[in-house]
């Protein structure tokens, strides 16, 4: 696992998201570019900051209100449009932030099993390699997926069991 490195603007956004979700007392993980930085060593330099948080649907509006009171931008129309998606779309200093609600067992387990990784003076949580590989698979990011799968830390048998359990047997990785 690599120490997370980010350009200053994104580093500020990552810290703000971690602070917001921690203050709201949510279990959460960073996915997307932050997880990519942890697993592959790529710096966070562009794009959105994405997190998955364990919370009830009724907490979405509370999170949006708290975000707005802590320097985040909240577009009410966009928030209303995302109602069915279990997503809280916000911004911080012009950077898009997506907080996905862990509304099913797969995401809930991903949050519960997350690993800790260093970022500046704080510890962030990101999905385990096998869960990150599943996210890469769903994003069709074959190059990054192969890098993760070929890592000595990767549990192919565990990954394959998870794929079979969720009905994706055709994506099993040869052992």
How would you describe each model-predicted region?
Residues 1-175:
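Compositionally biased terminal segments of proteins
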């Amino acid at each position: 696992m690599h120490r997370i490195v980010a350009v200053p603007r994104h580093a500020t956004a990552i810290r703000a998201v971690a602070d917001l979700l921690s203050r709201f007392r949510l279990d959460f993980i960073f996915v997307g570019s932050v997880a990519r930085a942890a697993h592959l060593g790529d710096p966070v330099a562009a794009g959105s900051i994405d997190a998955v948080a364990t919370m009830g649907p009724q907490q979405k509006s509370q999170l949006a209100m708290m975000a707005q009171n802590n320097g985040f931008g909240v577009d009410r129309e966009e928030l209303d449009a995302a109602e069915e998606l279990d997503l809280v779309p916000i911004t911080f200093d012009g950077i898009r932030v997506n907080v996905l609600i862990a509304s099913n067992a797969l995401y809930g387990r991903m949050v519960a099993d997350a690993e800790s990784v260093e970022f500046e003076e704080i510890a962030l949580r990101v999905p385990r390699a096998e869960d990150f590989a599943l996210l890469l698979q769903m994003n069709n990011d074959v190059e990054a997926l192969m890098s993760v799968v070929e890592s000595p830390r990767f549990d192919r048998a565990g990954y394959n069991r998870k794929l079979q359990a969720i009905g994706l047997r055709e994506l099993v990785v040869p052992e």
